[in-house]
Amino acid sequence: MTNATEQTYLWHRFTLREAVLLCFCATFIVLTRAGLRLHLHLPGHVMFCTMFFLLLARGCVPKLGSATLVGLITSLTSVLLGMGAGGPMVLVKFLLPALVVELAGFLSPAFVTSLLACATVGVLASMLRAASTTGVEMLIGMDEEIMLRKALISAAMNGLWGGLGALAVPSIIRRLRINGLIELKTEKSGAT
């Protein structure tokens, strides 16, 4: 899919095609977050699409920094649009799951083709996101018993939704590779 003369533009790592694809994934996270602001009474439901697009970005662009870039763009856009009551804490809420996806991609570059690995990464990243709000509640002095119960429920629901969103990624990545829409390459073979 890529030409031999294709240049890297963003962070001296991503081609223009890859950067546009990563920006689309970040945009879809923001759009689904805005669309899911409905009061569904389902805690953590936003993590379904967040984990889906973070893992899809890592699967389509298997380079170090791809999920981090998606998380950074998503968090900055969310802050600029005023989405969420956390203020600058929104940066952490998107960057922490992205860093978990990056760590998983660093340890096992082909993890996006495994259902179990994707589900595990989705659950862990989503639970870490829930822990970030617990840290803020601890700093403001919330009662420990209430905070721990809320943290447990929030982590469980975020993990459930994040894991469910992650389960769709391996089949989509396989189908994209079969149809020739993305290449099977790793960090070592993708570097020019």
Predicted regions and their residues:
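Membrane-embedded alpha-helical hairpins and interfacial helices in multi-pass inner-membrane proteins
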Residues: 111-192
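Interfacial aromatic-anchored transmembrane helix boundaries in multi-pass membrane proteins
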Residues: 31-43, 74-103, 137
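Aromatic-anchored segments of alpha-helical transmembrane domains
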Residues: 26-35, 72-81, 122-132
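Hydrophobic transmembrane alpha-helices
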Residues: 2-60, 65
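Hydrophobic alpha-helical transmembrane segments
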Residues: 19-24, 48, 52, 64-72, ...
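Juxtamembrane membrane-interface segments at transmembrane alpha-helix termini
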Residues: 56-62, 80-88, 103-110, 129-135
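Short helix-perturbing small/polar motifs within transmembrane alpha-helices
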Residues: 3-6, 10, 20-25, 92-134, ...
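Juxtamembrane/transmembrane-helix boundary motifs in multi-pass membrane proteins
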Residues: 9, 13, 17, 42, ...
